Amino acid sequence: LVNNRIMLQEKFSKQPQINTLILTNNILDKKFMDKVTEIIENEIDNVNFSVDQLVAQMGIARTKLFTKLKAITGQTPSDLIMTIRLKRAAYLLKNNPELNISEISDRTGFSFPKYFSKCFKKKYHVTPQAYRKEEIQI
């Protein structure tokens, strides 16, 4: 059971879509994750968006948010924010070839394109440019 949970968390983390159904096995967790995801997506271009703002918008204690997200996703709140930013970037790279890397970096809340590229490569093991070429050829 624990191994299945870990596999699902890894699958959620690695796939480019945001699909909370993979992670949740009850309606309360699904609603919780939908709300967290919605808040992060609404603030995705906000460079200053932080865990503190997520906590305030969720209306729960920081430790409660941390514990619940860690249990469901296997990630800390800041890691989840980064994961969702990078998933959006992957989507934009695939579906918006007219946007350059700097524009995608801005639209996903990164202050600097170089930092965005570094984070993207760490997550997907390929640069944003290479990911775009790979995805467009498919």
Regions found by a protein language model. Give the residues of each.
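Receiver (REC) domain switch/output surface
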Residues: 1-5
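Intrinsically disordered or compositionally simple regulatory linkers and C-terminal tails
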Residues: 10-25
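Short, Lys/Arg-enriched anionic-surface-contact patches
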Residues: 23-33, 75-84
